[in-house]
Amino acid sequence: MAETKIIYHMDEEETPYLVKLPVAPERVTLADFKNVLSNRPVHAYKFFFKSMDQDFGVVKEEIFDDNAKLPCFNGRVVSWLVLVEGAHSDAGSQGTDSHTDLPPPLERTGGIGDSRSPSFQPDVASSRDGMDNETGTESMVSHRRDRARRRNREEAARTNGHPRGDRRRDVGLPPDSASTALSSELESSSFVDSDEDDSTSRLSSSTEQSTSSRLIRKHKRRRRKQRLRQADRASSFSSMTDSTMSLNIITVTLNMERHHFLGICIVGQSNDRGDGGIYIGSIMKGGAVAADGRIEPGDMLLQVNDVNFENMSNDDAVRVLREIVSQTGPISLTVAKCWDPTPRSYFTVPRPDPVRPIDPAAWLSHTAALTGALPRPQLEEAPLTVESDMNTVVRVMQLPDSGLEIRDRMWLKITIANAVIGADVVDWLYTHVEGFKERREARKYASSLLKHGFLRHTVNKITFSEQCYYVFGDLCSNLATLNLNSGSSGTSDQDTLAPLPHPAAPWPLGQGYPYQYPGPPPCFPPAYQDPGFSYGSGSTGSQQSEGSKSSGSTRNTLRPPACEKERRAAGSGDSDSESDHTAPSGVGSSWRERPADQLSRGSSPRSQASSYAPGLPPPHPTTKAYTVVGGPPGGPPVRELAAVPPELTGSRQSFQKAMGNPCEFFVDIM
């Protein structure tokens, strides 16, 4: 005999039911299926069956005609029973018992209404295992008895820690709720009073169906009355659930006259329990959605125009969306903003949540304003005008938040660091500096900045152009780029100053210092007389002829040959002349000699007194100069001027002239 297997799912129960009908698969009807379910309130359910559509493939088709043939796959029928909203039968009462007005339909289990953890398992399935052998009333009564026992055991651990005396005005969540009460799409009215009439727990199997339904309707009316009183308690529910993390739902109206296409790619989510909704996969440039900017990839599509997708399968939603897009006129899209696509835990904070990370810059400025430790400079508070100092204008222009784009730029494959475009400079001046009646005046001001050196062209052009790159060349920038070691290669000739010796330290021997030192007092031993030093009094020095011997000494071995010529020629004199030795102390430095008579003529008692070494008494007025003929120990040998080749003595007169007035003639050319 032919037999048909029907597998049907009840609400959100994970385990399906199997019944066998003694009817051939091609002849089974909805009436045959309802006859098997005589112990269930079939009039309170909608019947959906697995079917095949030519356009969309496998779909869930609703069949309500009792004489309609049921679609069959591989000799069996797959069905889903969905509770009808507002049904006041035993099944409707049982749905009321699970604390939801409208349980989420099976197709949308993965949508925004399902906020349970993956480990959540409803307890209703265990209480309905024997449903086939019971009447609808007996099943409801036994279910309520189990709930009453569990409520008595868990009375001490009520939701939110409210005491027993407050349970008339507080809400509670039964642990065996058949559907989630934590969904963000459910309002606070979903949480009903956990106290119920004791009479419903004492119903026996002899209770008539009408009596049970009347009691449930009375309880339902009372619950609706409480809904208005407890509407403001939803936000006070436990913060450990998703109830306080409701999604941000927005409605966007798009004008399709300006944009020819919608510009979205949709993605459908499905699992073993049904479809989970339509989501925005990606957004194409140039479309109406991209021009609006409020809809982002990952948002869930809830409604298009007046068509709600909540109770639709993914295939039906796609079909409706295609029909609406093909029509003319504006399109309204209602979407739920997505959460963080990469959550670190199950409970995540929505992206539009007002809690934001701390901005360090804003925190620093706020703290400075409160403490007063970092007052804002007067430079930023005073408005800039055409009468302001150019240096001030340029410094404000260089601030990081000035609004002028200063960055590294490429020109002819050359990187120009911290450069600006001339047009940006003119626009910034015209916007931030008061007093310009038209942009042409701001351009003239920028040209004056270039002329005064505050702006500098890459190739040092003096005419201002708005298409050229410029860098800041003001004094502040130049000073900031200076380096004490810039240009020092170790072999270049530089004029530097040596450090003064410590007053308490003895004077070292055999070293040359660029200062005038007095002769030693008579009490000092002769060993103190360093051949490298000589002192000239202003009354005894005289210029001598070229045939005299040189009283100076040289210690430079890195001096260029031309400088060596001038040094040796200028250092000539006889044994009675005194020379003033001045030299830098850096590496690679040289001695510069000056005749004593020129020094004495241009000096004053004050200048002479300032040249004495610290820590030593000034010389006696009658003290004569100590002059040692010959070079210092370890230095090059000293030769007479006659022994110098004639070609090396030509610059003697010019060097002496330069030393006579060094402030006027000295030019250091490396």
Swiss-Prot record:
Pfam families: DEP, Dishevelled, DIX, Dsh_C, PDZ. CDD domains: DEP_dishevelled, PDZ_Dishevelled-like. Residues 251-323 form the PDZ domain. Residues 152-171 have a biased composition (Basic and acidic residues). Keywords: Cytoplasm, Developmental protein, Wnt signaling pathway. Residues 89-240, 518-642 are annotated as: Disordered. Expressed in thymus, heart, liver, kidney, brain, skeletal muscle, and pancreas. Residues 1-85 form the DIX domain. One of its GO terms (cellular component) is cytosol. It is found in: Cytoplasm. SMART domains: DAX (SM00021), DEP (SM00049), PDZ (SM00228). One of its GO terms (molecular function) is frizzled binding. The keyword Transcription regulation does not apply. May play a role in the signal transduction pathway mediated by multiple Wnt genes. This is Putative segment polarity protein dishevelled homolog DVL1P1. It comes from Homo sapiens (Human). The gene is DVL1P1.
